[in-house]
């Protein structure tokens, strides 16, 4: 028993030596945080955890004008560094407010070059579907789907509220996407869950030959009551599942864990709502 307790104590010591809570200073306000792990561009072979989020600095309204980033080496999650504002957009004399963002890495199979796509969720008029790209996870980032005057997104830009992007690398040489090396999908919505496959040539529009899943997960505006049209078919549900159990509200976030795909989102408050 003593040996077991000592082992547990040592494990706890190791955990506290490499992590802390709260992990960011109390003066920082970074909601909508999306965690990602990328190779450190300044230390090849080393990896960092990146937190990308909106920035609550407006006080009287949600979020602020910048996408904020903090990062830490994966081997020591107590050493967080402020990477600063990694993206803002100024047009017509004012800054766009930025809501919940996402950031993904795409690696070219032939050259090995990495490109980072930022989905900043601008709330600027006609700029909500804005997508940016850069050569480093901490930027700088340049919009790739805006008109020349920076006021509007170009045709085909349809991504909406709280986007989450999933990049799936292709390893099967028989797969038609093997030469490209990946496929990408986007999930988004506010009280209405939508998903579709991205065109890998643009990373902001629908891939030709595919369709939009306009009702991906059942949404609610009251707990347990589906607000989608009666008879809606959901591609993300098994036949036995009850649509009233999902209560999608906003904040899509998807990951692959082992051989399973895990969809996380903010649900409409109810008896099973909680934070942990």
Model-derived features: where do they sit?
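Carbohydrate-active catalytic/glycan-binding domains of CAZyme proteins
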Residues: 19-276
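Bacterial Sec-dependent N-terminal signal peptides
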Residues: 1-20
